[in-house]
């Protein structure tokens, strides 16, 4: 629905020579992760690897006030099982790939509108998820997998392929 609405808007904006602004906020890959079955099927459980730092339980949960009763941590059994972590990772990979396909549809529509060469695009996320790292599933931690989110910028004057490791906050944009 989000990609359809965005594409419809771009179709209208492409007919108008005035600048436009569009903010798109997908729910994915947040819970509930609801990827179509054909995306889930691309990630058979037997091919899903556990994170190298997999633990059945987060060892510092009591010290940081992160009990098993926190919402994200109730999404799977405690202690963590290898199967539950693999299922969560399967769903996460599938919904990310589905999101990528939807973003691709929007970018295709932008290209067809004739506005792609004079449009700035910023892609980011609000946080990552543990999805089995350190015995955690959610975002209630300060590990890099939860705090180091993508930020991609494309547009006139932005050098393709440039990388910058400086910290950024979405409000900086």
Model-found features: residue ranges?
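Catalytic core of tubulin tyrosine ligase-like
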Residues: 173
